[in-house]
Amino acid sequence: MEKTQETVQRILLEPYKYLLQLPGKQVRTKLSQAFNHWLKVPEDKLQIIIEVTEMLHNASLLIDDIEDNSKLRRGFPVAHSIYGIPSVINSANYVYFLGLEKVLTLNHPDAVKLFTRQLLELHQGQGLDIYWRDNYTCPTEEEYKAMVLQKTGGLFGLAVGLMQLFSDYKEDLKPLLDTLGLFFQIRDDYANLHSKEYSENKSFCEDLTEGKFSFPTIHAIWSRPESTQVQNILRQRTENIDIKKYCVHYLENVGSFEYTRNTLKELESKAYKQIDARGGNPELVALIKHLSKMFKEENE
């Protein structure tokens, strides 16, 4: 018996829907709404843009979890541990193209161009991240930041870029978006290795098990070139809690967490200055303040 289009759609989207029902922070949606303080995009267009950004973000998480061999996402089993890798890859790719289909409904000649450019950026950043990890090549801090701007900046840039197509506000927001992109990713890196809440939601220090070069580990590796401890731990892809606790202790001792916190504080105040220079934005400031609590409270 021929399956109806609706049934097929349901089967294809099941892994994606599974991820959607997990509790998320909705940071991207809040960010778009905050930027609308300046951009004043019509509500119907804004809703489509928010939907597209969320679709792409969530689809990229499905793929991320496969590429990173993750066990948990938001404290629940990753989609591919339930549905299998082939179904999840297909589901995520399907959602990318549903996102493209939605972008077409915006009816703007530049929308697809922007979509394509930002998705290429996203994949370039992601590809570099994986390459460094799997070839045991530690990037410099500058190389890492450039990669982050492609990876996190890809979707940030898409949301705000699409919004600007429907706005009279034409000021260049890229410098601010870059600051926010770095802030979000470095905060995430810090949380993965240092925050209690994160270790309850993801397996403890998952970035170490994954072998990922993140902001604190890159600092530790370059600031102590005579020691190869961190590289060796990352190379092992270890799930051993004691080794991971030792690594966190080492990062603390060589000042990598302090360096990361200071970098985050600098990015935070840089963002406030950039926001002020554009006439202020209370919603955006409130969002950044909320996200900054994590690396301040912990250490007080």
Curated annotation (Swiss-Prot):
Binding-site residues, isopentenyl diphosphate: 25, 28, 57, 74
Free-text comment on the cofactor: Binds 2 Mg(2+) ions per subunit.
An annotated GO cellular component: perinuclear region of cytoplasm
Pathway participation: Isoprenoid biosynthesis; farnesyl diphosphate biosynthesis; farnesyl diphosphate from geranyl diphosphate and isopentenyl diphosphate: step 1/1; Isoprenoid biosynthesis; geranyl diphosphate biosynthesis; geranyl diphosphate from dimethylallyl diphosphate and isopentenyl diphosphate: step 1/1; Isoprenoid biosynthesis; geranylgeranyl diphosphate biosynthesis; geranylgeranyl diphosphate from farnesyl diphosphate and isopentenyl diphosphate: step 1/1
The enzyme's E.C. designation: 2.5.1.-, 2.5.1.1, 2.5.1.29, 2.5.1.10
PROSITE patterns in the record: POLYPRENYL_SYNTHASE_1 (PS00723), POLYPRENYL_SYNTHASE_2 (PS00444)
Positions contributing to Mg(2+) 2 binding: 64, 68
Subcellular location: Cytoplasm; Cytoplasm, Perinuclear region; Cytoplasm, Myofibril, Sarcomere, Z line
Cofactor requirements of the protein: Mg(2+)
Top-rank lineage group of the source organism: Eukaryota
Reaction it catalyzes: isopentenyl diphosphate + dimethylallyl diphosphate = (2E)-geranyl diphosphate + diphosphate; isopentenyl diphosphate + (2E)-geranyl diphosphate = (2E,6E)-farnesyl diphosphate + diphosphate; isopentenyl diphosphate + (2E,6E)-farnesyl diphosphate = (2E,6E,10E)-geranylgeranyl diphosphate + diphosphate
Residues the entry annotates as binding Mg(2+) 1: 64, 68
Residues that bind dimethylallyl diphosphate: 73, 151-152, 185, 202, 212
UniProt keyword terms in alphabetical order: Acetylation, Cytoplasm, Isoprene biosynthesis, Lipid metabolism, Magnesium, Metal-binding, Transferase
GO BP annotations, alphabetical order: farnesyl diphosphate biosynthetic process; geranyl diphosphate biosynthetic process; geranylgeranyl diphosphate biosynthetic process; isoprenoid biosynthetic process; isoprenoid metabolic process
Record InterPro entries: Isoprenoid_synthase_dom_sf, Polyprenyl_synt, Polyprenyl_synt_CS
GO molecular function: (2E,6E)-farnesyl diphosphate synthase activity; dimethylallyltranstransferase activity; geranylgeranyl diphosphate synthase activity; identical protein binding; metal ion binding
Modified residues (N-acetylmethionine): 1
Main localization category: cytoplasm
Role: Catalyzes the trans-addition of the three molecules of IPP onto DMAPP to form geranylgeranyl pyrophosphate, an important precursor of carotenoids and geranylated proteins.
Recorded family membership: Belongs to the FPP/GGPP synthase family.
Subunit composition and interactions: Homohexamer; trimer of homodimers.
Name listed for the protein in its UniProt record: Geranylgeranyl pyrophosphate synthase
Source species taxonomy: Eukaryota, Metazoa, Chordata, Craniata, Vertebrata
